[in-house]
A protein has these predicted regions:
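Conserved P-loop NTPase mechanochemical-coupling segment
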Residues: 46-47, 103-124
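Walker A/P-loop
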Residues: 75-109, 138
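Pre-Walker A (pre-P-loop) alpha-helix and adjacent loop at the N terminus of AAA/AAA+ ATPase modules
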Residues: 37-82
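Conserved catalytic network of the ASCE P-loop NTPase/AAA+ motor domain
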Residues: 70-74, 97-100, 137-142, 158-161
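Conserved alpha-helical scaffold flanking the Walker A/P-loop in AAA+ ATPase domains
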Residues: 124-148
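Interdomain "pre-motor" coupling segment immediately N-terminal to P-loop NTPase/helicase cores
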Residues: 1-41
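Conserved AAA+/SF3 P-loop NTPase catalytic/coupling segment centered on the Walker-B
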Residues: 141-167
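Alpha-helical scaffold elements adjacent to nucleotide-binding pockets in ATP/GTP-utilizing enzyme cores
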Residues: 59, 95-96, 117, 162-167
Length: 167
């Protein structure tokens, strides 16, 4: 496969971190569950539990209905949930992932100070590491998990290392 080829083609001076990343990918394997609903999920319970999210659920119903008419796996448009603290945005995302039967990954932006934490650092850097999104996809069971980037408005860091740049 492509990962094996990339590992074999690494130059002798390649970083140990990059080599370890490829090896980790090989150990994890290339197979992931890819969620594709056969029927429209029952959003009614979720809508009763979290009535503030009715408009979002309507959009999701439409996206999922369209997906069901194709051969493609479920891919939802990224969404920004706005609202006061405590209205249930994170809870909504967790419940949505459960309803869809896919993975859930949480990334708290208030504590991130560098852009590479989300997207990963370039292999040219000595201590390069993959980012949180990579970790969710390689270490998770699903190819299309729900990934929550929480408190995006609280992302810190100067413009040179802006964590939002990778989004």
């Amino acid at each position: 496969g492509r990962v094996e080829s990339a590992l074999d083609e690494l130059p002798a001076g390649a970083s140990d971190a990059l080599r370890a990343t490829y090896e980790r990918m090989l150990r994890a394997g290339g197979e992931r569950f890819c969620v594709k609903p056969g029927v429209l999920p029952d959003f009614d319970v979720l809508e009763q539990e979290l009535p503030n999210f009715g408009d979002v659920l309507d959009d999701l119903r439409k996206q999922i209905a369209l997906c069901m008419e194709t051969e493609d796996p479920l891919e939802l448009t990224p969404m920004l949930l706005l609202g006061d603290p405590g209205i249930g945005k994170t809870h909504f995302a967790r419940r949505l992932s459960k309803l869809l039967g896919t993975g859930y990954n949480f990334i708290g932006m208030s504590s991130l100070t560098a852009g590479w934490i989300l997207s990963g650092a370039s292999a040219q850097w000595k201590n390069a590491k993959p980012g949180k999104v990579f970790d969710a996809l390689v270490n998770g069971d699903y190819a299309n998990p729900v990934i929550v980037v929480d408190e995006i408005d609280k992302a810190s860091g100067d413009s040179q290392y802006d964590p939002l740049g990778s989004l």
